Amino acid sequence: PRCLDAFFQCLKTGCSAEGRQLEEVERLRACLALLAIAAVRLLQLKLAARDDPDRPANQCAPALHVAVLAAYRGRPTEGWTARQFWREVAKLGGFLGRKPDGEPGWQTIWRGWRKLDLMTIGVTLAQTQGLRCG
């Protein structure tokens, strides 16, 4: 039940499922199907960061996402843990990471994940087109 509650909280709050205000049933179904996949993925990352924080990030997140985030932060890809990856995604979404702040919320995680996802899409496009920066 707790996991199910967390899933719906992620779907509702983080993914803003209610705010989509789709009027046609088919559009709502398609939107919820996509958002549910994202919510499950984010919930898996959260559980990995909480339950097994020292687990290598490449085992719980796509390797490209870890590599892009590491490059963005100017750090080596090796040695990233699930918890470190989770908090860095949250920082992309505006999380400050101070001690009294507690854990990041779903909206912050969702914003950070969307930014990271856009960065990985950009890297993938640049690689397929043979583009280079600098």
Predicted features along the sequence, with ranges:
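Short, surface-exposed loop/turn motifs that are enriched in glycine and acidic residues
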Residues: P1, Q21-R27
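Short, conserved catalytic/metal-binding motifs centered on acidic residues
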Residues: P1-T13, I37
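Short runs of predominantly hydrophobic/aromatic residues within well-ordered alpha helices
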Residues: L4-F7, L28-L34, A82
